[in-house]
Amino acid sequence: MTEYNGYVTDETIEGADDGPLAGKTVAVKDNISTEGVRTTCGSAMLEDYVPPYDATVVERLKDAGATIPGKTNMDEFGMGTTTETSAFGAVENPAAEGRVPGGSSGGSAAVVAAGDADLALGSDTGGSIRCPAAFCGVVGIKPTYGLVSRYGLIAYANSLEQIGPIAPSVEGAAELLDVIAGPDEHDATTQEAPEADGSYAAAADGDVDGLSIGVPTELLDGADEAVVETFWDAMDDLEAQGASYHEVDLPSVEHAVEAYYVIAMSEASSNLARFDGVRYGQSGGYDGNWNESFANAREQGFGEEVKRRILLGTYALSAGYHDKYYKKAQDARAWVKQDFDEALDDADVLASPTMPVPPMKRGESLDDPLTMYLADANTTPVNLANLPAISVPAGETDDGLPVGLQLVGPAFGERQIIRAGSALA
């Protein structure tokens, strides 16, 4: 284990003798299946679960010669923004003492920031790669939905989540994306990206001369003053390298957080129904009837945040409320996607602070879930729109806290955001 509690399991998995990742260590988030090595999702419910197969991305890592040093800590079932809801203890931030590392892939970002792994895989449902990358001062890519296989990812919200890379540099993240991207017969949502020149890593050339950047004003409104100041400094840096920027409007993002949480919680209530102590998960005992056994397993196995989201999701899907909540959330999702598509007609990429706040103090948001949800305001819209995004270090506040800059591209426009991001990191 690391001093930052970045790993849940530090069991080494060896890859092939050679390949593009030979000699490199790639940590894997603990909701991604690894054959013969336990995969807990940060939950007591799956404390002893050992998958009988590898996720597709794990197979691709091994084939590429990577060594997996362990499974990284995470918010339970990916539900959190701080990596404090794990049943295996909170993760500390190597880049900001006493602050959270972000979530839910906080362990992956922390081990990369601390130098305990060269690279890492996370998963991003509403910002779970980009948030910890921003808070830990590293790079994280949320790929276009369908670019990377989700086979072997223990699902939280199927229509939103993607597996992606975390690295110290944009080039390193792009090299990892080159390995894991591509169609998979085991995941019908994957698709072939349109043909393009060169690898993702080759796009990390730092050339932003002539790049047009749209800045959505709505994603700056209400952001912390120090974050906004650091963001504009980074934008000035890009401008000095030949890029230009202008304001764009995304009026729909005002409703993105609530739409995201209705959809994500609804999908979670369905996905997590399988963890009942009989099909999957720790047993609730065999005293009493089946309902009591199921209830005991879920009461003991799930943490408070997971229970909250399951209950809210079940409510949103219940008879009489489906049209009131879930259908309206899906309508808002379509509006968000339309707004992004229109904004990207007038810009090559969009830019905003990754997170509207710097890393919070540990323990600060645990008793205030609404504050934690609202911190996702800049990242969740991208998942609703199924677009690619990257978080790169923009600098630090006067207090020395890391700030991330998010770049969003059109569908399968990973090379555009990688090229833009590599001018900064």
Curated annotation (Swiss-Prot):
This enzyme's EC code(s): 6.3.5.7
Active site as annotated: K29 (charge relay system), S104 (charge relay system), S128 (acyl-ester intermediate)
InterPro entries on file: Amidase (IPR000120), Amidase_CS (IPR020556), Amidase_dom (IPR023631), AS_sf (IPR036928), GatA (IPR004412)
Keywords: ATP-binding, Ligase, Nucleotide-binding, Protein biosynthesis
Protein name, per record: Glutamyl-tRNA(Gln) amidotransferase subunit A
PANTHER family: GLUTAMYL-TRNA(GLN) AMIDOTRANSFERASE SUBUNIT A, MITOCHONDRIAL, TRANSAMIDASE
EC primary class: ligase
Domain of life: Archaea
Source organism per UniProt: Haloarcula marismortui (strain ATCC 43049 / DSM 3752 / JCM 8966 / VKM B-1809)
Record field: catalytic activity: L-glutamyl-tRNA(Gln) + L-glutamine + ATP + H2O = L-glutaminyl-tRNA(Gln) + L-glutamate + ADP + phosphate + H(+)
Signal peptide: none
Subunit description: Heterotrimer of A, B and C subunits.
The keyword 4Fe-4S is assigned to this record: no
GO cellular component, one term: glutamyl-tRNA(Gln) amidotransferase complex
One family name in Pfam for this protein: Amidase
Gene3D superfamilies reported in the protein's UniProt record: Amidase signature (AS) domain (3.90.1300.10)
GO terms, molecular function: ATP binding; glutaminyl-tRNA synthase (glutamine-hydrolyzing) activity
Role this protein plays: Allows the formation of correctly charged Gln-tRNA(Gln) through the transamidation of misacylated Glu-tRNA(Gln) in organisms which lack glutaminyl-tRNA synthetase. The reaction takes place in the presence of glutamine and ATP through an activated gamma-phospho-Glu-tRNA(Gln).
SUPFAM superfamilies: Amidase signature (AS) enzymes
Single biological process term from Gene Ontology: translation
Family membership: Belongs to the amidase family. GatA subfamily.
